[in-house]
Amino acid sequence: MNTGLEISILHNLEMSKLLDTINSPSDLKKLSLDELRELAVQIREELVNRVTLNGGHLASSLGVVELTIALHRVFESPKDKIIWDVGHQSYAHKLLTGRREQFATLRQHGGLSGFTCRDESPHDPFGAGHASTSISAGLGMAVARDLAKEDYSVISVIGDGAISGGMSFEAINNAGHLHTKFIVILNDNGMAISPSTGALSKFLNNVRFDPRFEFAKRNAKQTITNMPFGKAVWAFTKSIKRKFEKSMLPGSLWEELGFIYLGPVDGHNIRELEAALKRAKDFESKPVLIHMITKKGKGYDDAEADAVKYHGISPKSGGLKSSHGLSYSQVFGQTLHKIMSQNPQVVAITAAMTDGCGLGEIAAAFPDRVFDVGICEQHAVTFAAGMATQGYIPVVVIYSTFLQRGFDQIIHDVCLQKLPVVFAIDRGGIVGDDGKTHQGIFDLSFMSLIPDMVVSAPSDENDLQHLIYTAVNSGKPFALRYPRGFGEGAEIESSLHNIPIGQNEILVNGSDVAILATGKSVAFAKDALEILTESGIKPTLVNNRYISPLDSELVLKIAQSHKYLVTVEENVISGGLGSRINTLLAEAGLVNKIKIANIGIPDKFVEHGNQSLLRAKYGLDGKGIAQRVLSLVGNPNEMKHPQIICP
């Protein structure tokens, strides 16, 4: 017979294996409430351990553990479609949908994505990485289901930050109009929307959440409308109810938009969550919004105390390190701070990336001149355009991948009107572990095709500060694109000066071979020069800081005095620096007089992996550039340096 202590030990051993027993969502349905609570603890431990090793989005995933468990107990994934907005809070979802054994590879090259990915699992019905897409995608799936006369649930999970994006409201408006059966879960972690408070509010919402209330409401309507003048009485009663709700209830906005509102629900109470999800599942004729209150970073004290800091973290090992001290974002922030101190007409605008873009100290110093508009990139661009019409010089500070969302506004609202808006494009080029949705490899192409847009990419920190100064004083639409990570250790001059627009510079004079590199690629081209010099090749190296307008005079001069021309860029080749130079040489009739090679990203989406690995894979590091040059011109010292293998 087992003693109480032995039973306790056996119980603890069984509990310790809970996460290991979950191979699919169906396994969750066998667990008791106590076991589910223990499972939530184990999931959080796994998330903290793995994300601190691999890096990733921690606080968001910690906040939705109970929701993830409840979703997979109430619904039948992958038949039912669960869509995670942005996807960075889907780590627990990955653990519970058969990816536990692969979880150690999270955000590693060839491993699990840090976001949802259709290619990765049938439990990921929609890929993500950018915000505010889940409601549109979910509504599309729900309408497709109804057209095909199929039967499954569609659930979109969206945070209070992402729901501020304009695309979310477009989808909400459409969903209310269509009256499609569809569930939206609003994860309110207090970062953007204040939780409802007060005993009356809680009481009224509890009443409205109770199925008996819905039954009573239907019976009351039937009874009153069957009375003499009943329809008029019911209409009057309903109007009074709506006015009362509008002033007292947090759900009235959603009901006006055509949704049934349930909540607020404790997002860390599995029993409450399951009750809400089952209730929402029963509604047939309208979309339902469940308002869920959670704590971002739940279960990890450091993340709960500073959810912004722990939103995304770097790995303990293998993260970004530098002896140079300052990142490009920090140099940008310091330079803009100096400029704004001297010029009161300069303002900064960002879309929910104040700290990530280096604007934190500037916002503290100039709180009335730094505007965080939320996850609203389109609005950010046109808001900047409006300020520019009134004599201000707006600097829109934004990650490359998110700037894509404001492309029409850049053309229509800024460039067509020749407004002096500066676009400070952070995270240009290969960003690494966040993968396909976050690589900044298209900006040189889509910005360069716009008439009257100046497009530049600094070669180092010193180049960056002077280009910022040039942009602010240019009076033109001006884009400057800089990479993620630390600088090159360049000496930063104390005074700022203009760099003539369209003027590039020769860094090294050589012969026969000319390498025209832009941005971060200049540093790798310098590494390539060391290898090539050992091989008997002494190339010319150009810092091609301006992509548009091109320094046509310099390019043509080089083309006429060299046998080989190589372009290097961390951007898709199509439409980028290489394409623009190819076009220039073709128009000048020089393409048959010089051999050309374009080094850049091929026509594909770049997977996740650390920056060094990806640069090596795509031939963008020093060795890769040298190998490409050697394959173009041949190796005079091939026998002397057999370690260099040319493709």
From Swiss-Prot:
Q: Which PROSITE patterns does the protein's record reference?
A: TRANSKETOLASE_1 (PS00801)
* GO CC terms, sorted: cytosol
User: In the UniProt record, does the keyword Transferase occur?
Assistant: yes
Q: Which UniProt keywords apply?
A: Isoprene biosynthesis, Magnesium, Metal-binding, Thiamine biosynthesis, Thiamine pyrophosphate, Transferase
Gene Ontology MF terms in the entry: 1-deoxy-D-xylulose-5-phosphate synthase activity; magnesium ion binding; thiamine pyrophosphate binding
Q: An example of a Gene Ontology BP annotation on this entry?
A: isopentenyl diphosphate biosynthetic process, methylerythritol 4-phosphate pathway
Question: How cofactor binds (record note)?
Answer: Binds 1 Mg(2+) ion per subunit. Binds 1 thiamine pyrophosphate per subunit.
* Superkingdom of origin organism: Bacteria
- Sites binding Mg(2+) sit at D160, N189
Does the record carry Zinc as a key word? no
Cofactors: Mg(2+); thiamine diphosphate
Known EC number(s)? 2.2.1.7
Top enzyme class: transferase
Q: Please name the PANTHER family in this protein's record.
A: 1-D-DEOXYXYLULOSE 5-PHOSPHATE SYNTHASE-RELATED, 1-DEOXY-D-XYLULOSE-5-PHOSPHATE SYNTHASE, CHLOROPLASTIC
Q: What NCBIfam families does this protein's entry cite? A: dxs, PRK05444.2-2
Name the job this protein performs. Catalyzes the acyloin condensation reaction between C atoms 2 and 3 of pyruvate and glyceraldehyde 3-phosphate to yield 1-deoxy-D-xylulose-5-phosphate (DXP).
This one is known as 1-deoxy-D-xylulose-5-phosphate synthase
Species assigned in the record: Dehalococcoides mccartyi (strain CBDB1)
Q: Which gene encodes it?
A: dxs
